[in-house]
């Protein structure tokens, strides 16, 4: 028996003895082949030649089996189960948040070719059976699109929330919109008008009102500057005038009763309408662009036979506007 065989047997029994041979040892001793060995002349690791200077040794590199022994003085770690290393495809995953527009539009690819590469995961509807109604704002498609009517195009296209075509008007018939188009916006008149009051309200005691879009509601009868009883007189009886003596501004105090109040026939149209034109809509648009709300217009035909219009006179509201400006 030669000395080399004896030395190998002793080395296997005593791992603490250093190895003086130049041959590669496949021992599991910490001194010769462990990753925590302090010897710098260890040539048993194949990755020692490829190790760069200053590069730290990773615990998950250099072993084909994927397991690295712990450092000296520490118990070996229990191997992790394979289910943690590679999760199974049947494991539950986080469900993505569904969009508010999910299945609210038809899939173009499915409509053209009859198939879709995403299948059941497609965010669009495959047929009318999967099509859903999106949750819309209560005023969706109830107002005109200013960009479409002023510029002739809209960057939002079919997804715009405003009306591009008359067929898109989704307003309920018989119910006027609460929020209407403002006439003072770029001079664009609105095509819709508020429905007239019921016939039961058009009596001699309640005056008939004419509104334009974005106008304020009529004031209560108690707030009217002229009592409704003045309109219930006989057609030939002259209307009694009273001195209002308003105390709101100096110009109103200087105004005489004749310059403030005229006959009933003169109230058929506001005095400023003569300076604006003969079209009532033109007067309504100018009034809304000036003050934001329109002044009421009395209709003389309700209270008796029409009378010839008197000379144009200014109402107190226009005196206040001229003073404030």
From Swiss-Prot:
<feature type="compositionally biased region" description="Low complexity">
    <location>
        <begin position="285"/>
        <end position="295"/>
    </location>
</feature>
<feature type="repeat" description="P-P-P-P-G">
    <location>
        <begin position="196"/>
        <end position="200"/>
    </location>
</feature>
<dbReference type="GO" id="GO:0045600">
    <property type="term" value="P:positive regulation of fat cell differentiation"/>
</dbReference>
<dbReference type="GO" id="GO:0071889">
    <property type="term" value="F:14-3-3 protein binding"/>
</dbReference>
<dbReference type="GO" id="GO:0008270">
    <property type="term" value="F:zinc ion binding"/>
</dbReference>
<dbReference type="GO" id="GO:1990904">
    <property type="term" value="C:ribonucleoprotein complex"/>
</dbReference>
<keyword id="KW-0862">Zinc</keyword>
<dbReference type="GO" id="GO:0009611">
    <property type="term" value="P:response to wounding"/>
</dbReference>
<keyword id="KW-0217">Developmental protein</keyword>
<dbReference type="InterPro" id="IPR045877">
    <property type="entry name" value="ZFP36-like"/>
</dbReference>
<feature type="modified residue" description="Phosphothreonine">
    <location>
        <position position="90"/>
    </location>
</feature>
<keyword id="KW-0963">Cytoplasm</keyword>
<feature type="repeat" description="P-P-P-P-G">
    <location>
        <begin position="69"/>
        <end position="73"/>
    </location>
</feature>
<dbReference type="GO" id="GO:0071364">
    <property type="term" value="P:cellular response to epidermal growth factor stimulus"/>
</dbReference>
<keyword id="KW-0509">mRNA transport</keyword>
<dbReference type="GO" id="GO:0051028">
    <property type="term" value="P:mRNA transport"/>
</dbReference>
<dbReference type="GO" id="GO:0032897">
    <property type="term" value="P:negative regulation of viral transcription"/>
</dbReference>
<keyword id="KW-0813">Transport</keyword>
<keyword id="KW-0271">Exosome</keyword>
<dbReference type="GO" id="GO:0060213">
    <property type="term" value="P:positive regulation of nuclear-transcribed mRNA poly(A) tail shortening"/>
</dbReference>
<feature type="region of interest" description="Necessary for interaction with PABPN1">
    <location>
        <begin position="101"/>
        <end position="192"/>
    </location>
</feature>
<feature type="compositionally biased region" description="Low complexity">
    <location>
        <begin position="204"/>
        <end position="214"/>
    </location>
</feature>
<dbReference type="GO" id="GO:0010494">
    <property type="term" value="C:cytoplasmic stress granule"/>
</dbReference>
<feature type="repeat" description="P-P-P-P-G">
    <location>
        <begin position="217"/>
        <end position="222"/>
    </location>
</feature>
<keyword id="KW-0832">Ubl conjugation</keyword>
<dbReference type="GO" id="GO:0044344">
    <property type="term" value="P:cellular response to fibroblast growth factor stimulus"/>
</dbReference>
<dbReference type="GO" id="GO:0043488">
    <property type="term" value="P:regulation of mRNA stability"/>
</dbReference>
<feature type="modified residue" description="Phosphoserine">
    <location>
        <position position="86"/>
    </location>
</feature>
<keyword id="KW-0687">Ribonucleoprotein</keyword>
<dbReference type="GO" id="GO:0003729">
    <property type="term" value="F:mRNA binding"/>
</dbReference>
<feature type="region of interest" description="Necessary for nuclear export">
    <location>
        <begin position="1"/>
        <end position="15"/>
    </location>
</feature>
<keyword id="KW-0539">Nucleus</keyword>
<dbReference type="GO" id="GO:0070935">
    <property type="term" value="P:3'-UTR-mediated mRNA stabilization"/>
</dbReference>
<feature type="compositionally biased region" description="Low complexity">
    <location>
        <begin position="15"/>
        <end position="48"/>
    </location>
</feature>
<dbReference type="GO" id="GO:0035278">
    <property type="term" value="P:miRNA-mediated gene silencing by inhibition of translation"/>
</dbReference>
<feature type="compositionally biased region" description="Low complexity">
    <location>
        <begin position="75"/>
        <end position="101"/>
    </location>
</feature>
<feature type="region of interest" description="Necessary for localization of ARE-containing mRNAs to processing bodies (PBs)">
    <location>
        <begin position="98"/>
        <end position="325"/>
    </location>
</feature>
<dbReference type="GO" id="GO:0097011">
    <property type="term" value="P:cellular response to granulocyte macrophage colony-stimulating factor stimulus"/>
</dbReference>
<feature type="region of interest" description="Necessary for localization of ARE-containing mRNAs to processing bodies (PBs)">
    <location>
        <begin position="1"/>
        <end position="172"/>
    </location>
</feature>
<feature type="modified residue" description="Phosphoserine">
    <location>
        <position position="64"/>
    </location>
</feature>
<dbReference type="GO" id="GO:1900153">
    <property type="term" value="P:positive regulation of nuclear-transcribed mRNA catabolic process, deadenylation-dependent decay"/>
</dbReference>
<dbReference type="GO" id="GO:1901835">
    <property type="term" value="P:positive regulation of deadenylation-independent decapping of nuclear-transcribed mRNA"/>
</dbReference>
């Amino acid at each position: 028996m030669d000395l080399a065989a004896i030395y190998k047997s002793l080395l296997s029994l005593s791992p603490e003895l250093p190895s003086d041979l130049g041959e590669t040892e496949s021992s599991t001793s910490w001194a010769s082949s462990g990753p925590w060995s302090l010897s710098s002349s260890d040539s048993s690791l194949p990755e020692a030649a490829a190790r760069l200077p200053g590069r730290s040794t990773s615990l998950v590199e250099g072993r084909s089996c994927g397991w690295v022994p712990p450092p000296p003085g520490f118990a070996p770690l229990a191997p992790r189960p394979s289910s943690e290393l590679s999760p199974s495809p049947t494991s539950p995953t986080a469900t993505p948040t569904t969009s508010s527009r999910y299945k609210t539009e038809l899939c173009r690819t499915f409509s053209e070719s009859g198939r879709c590469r995403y299948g059941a995961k497609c965010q669009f509807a495959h047929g009318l059976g999967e099509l859903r109604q999106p949750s819309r704002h209560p005023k969706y498609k109830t107002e005109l699109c200013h960009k479409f009517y002023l510029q002739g195009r809209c960057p939002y296209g079919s997804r715009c929330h405003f009306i591009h075509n008359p067929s898109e008007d989704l307003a309920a018939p018989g119910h006027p919109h609460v929020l209407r188009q403002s006439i003072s916006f770029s001079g664009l008149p609105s095509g819709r008008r508020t429905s007239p009051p019921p016939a039961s309200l058009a009596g001699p005691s309640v005056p008939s009102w004419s509104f334009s879009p974005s106008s304020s509601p009529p004031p209560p009868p108690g707030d009217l500057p002229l009592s409704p009883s003045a309109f219930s007189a006989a057609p030939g009886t002259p209307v009694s005038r009273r001195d209002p003596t308003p105390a709101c501004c100096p110009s109103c105090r200087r105004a005489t009763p004749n310059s403030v109040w005229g006959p009933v026939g003169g109230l058929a149209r506001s005095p400023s309408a003569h300076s604006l034109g003969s079209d009532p809509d033109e007067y309504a648009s100018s009034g809304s662009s000036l003050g934001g709300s329109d002044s009421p217009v009395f209709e003389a035909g309700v209270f008796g036979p029409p009378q010839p219009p008197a000379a144009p006179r200014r109402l107190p509201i226009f005196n206040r506007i001229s003073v404030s400006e």
